[in-house]
Amino acid sequence: MLVLFETSGGFALFKVLDEGKLSNVEDLGTEFYSAESARRMGLHKFLKNNCDDGEILAVADPKLGDIITEKLDIECVHNDAVMELLRGVRSQLTELLSGLDDNDLAPVSLELSHILARYKLKITSDKVETMIILSISLLDDLDKELNTYTTSVCELYGLHFPELANIVQDNILYAKVVKLMGNRINAATLDFSEILADEVEAELKEASMVSTRTEVSDLDLMHIQELCDQVLSIAEDKTLLCDDLKNKMNKIAPNLTALVGELVGARLISHCGSLWNLSKLPWSTIQILGAEKTLYKALKTKQATPKYGLIYHAPLVRQAAPENKGKIARSLAAKSALAIRCDAFGNGQDNTMGVESRLKLEARLRNLEGGDLGACEEEEEVNDKDTKKEADDEEEPKTEECSKKRKKEAELETVEDPAKKSKQEGVTGLLLLMLLISLIYFFSVNQLLW
């Protein structure tokens, strides 16, 4: 029997000198305890040149054995005894093969592993899309947590200095001011130029001197400042997460990001599960994506369906006038459908298509909101200049035209009067006829009753 042994460097054939030992599988491993006992099996050349007719070939992979049997007409066997035999050969391979060292086999194994990795391991966008979905979910959680903490800071510090909420309306700046100031008495001696503008700083210092609210202990101020640290830490994490999300969206869906922004694009991908699923949707579905509950409720109650869903938060839709939001949302959804398919099915695409579509939509928005009005104003100015120059010449024709119009209106009135009269007479006749019928019916019913 011959044994085919596979390595990263090639193939090796071993011949079983004593096939009787294969009958006892448990004692087969004792033949490979030392290199001297394992070396008794000789080394042969490659398979086709050294396998004689009638030889049985032991292989580790049954699929490989089937291929060898089909191609070379060599009988192959695979069982527990063969696996134990190959395990012993593997343990003493460097001693069985002359001139082979572990250092020689390691580079070949590394190269083979790299080749297999190229075929088996493939970096796809699914992993990145999963990170986008998790990032947008984490961003929503950070927003909720940030709102909760900032509300707590405003409520707690408002007992001590309520005027600060009206002076500093930004939550992050509010937390920075509270952390730096502590007690409101310290505001007069502190420098807020790195945080606030000069006017706001002067107003803050003036309000701190006038405020007469309750005092707080140092322990309470310390807890409030620790809460401010949490607010600033969450805000910093949110900024880093937004930057990372923007980079990922520019790599996965650059055209969609150029049209609707990274946040809206990420929410659309998260709503559908992947960019591939989003690319299968028509533009009409993309337009109302995220407003499914409102849509089903409107269809059930037979009311007006929603015009937009998640796409409402896109910059182009937000900056449009209320009467133009529906038109811009419809156009943006159509362009977004093309951009999504370009990102999903294109290889190495940039954001050229998305930028061009955005410029077209911005031009359309300008035309809807003010382009036509400007053209009309120019025409009116030109007409005013012409009328000023030719005022004297046009006075007589205008009076003649006015008199002609009055004559035509008078003629139309005279023509329309008989028609109006005939219509009125017809209506009165119908009313009289209905009155007579009702009277006849009334008298007939009374006679039957009597």
UniProtKB/Swiss-Prot annotation:
Segments traversing the membrane: none
GO annotation terms (biological process): ribosome biogenesis
Keywords annotated in UniProt: Nucleus, Ribosome biogenesis
Every Nop domain range: 252-370
GO terms for MF: snoRNA binding
UniProt keyword Nucleus, yes or no: yes
Region feature (Disordered): 375-423
Entry's Gene Ontology cellular component terms: box C/D methylation guide snoRNP complex; nucleolus; small-subunit processome
Major subcellular location class: nucleus
Subcellular location: Nucleus, Nucleolus
Bias-annotated ranges (Basic and acidic residues): 399-423
InterPro entries: Nop56/Nop58 (IPR045056), Nop_C (IPR042239), Nop_dom (IPR002687), Nop_dom_sf (IPR036070), NOSIC (IPR012976)
Keyword Manganese: no
Pfam families, per database record: Nop
Top-level taxon in the UniProt lineage: Eukaryota
Gene3D superfamilies listed in its UniProt record: 1.10.287.4070, Nop domain
Family: Belongs to the NOP5/NOP56 family.
PANTHER family recorded: NUCLEOLAR PROTEIN 5 NUCLEOLAR PROTEIN NOP5 NOP58, NUCLEOLAR PROTEIN 58
Role this protein plays: Required for 60S ribosomal subunit biogenesis.
Protein name stated in the entry: Putative nucleolar protein 5-3
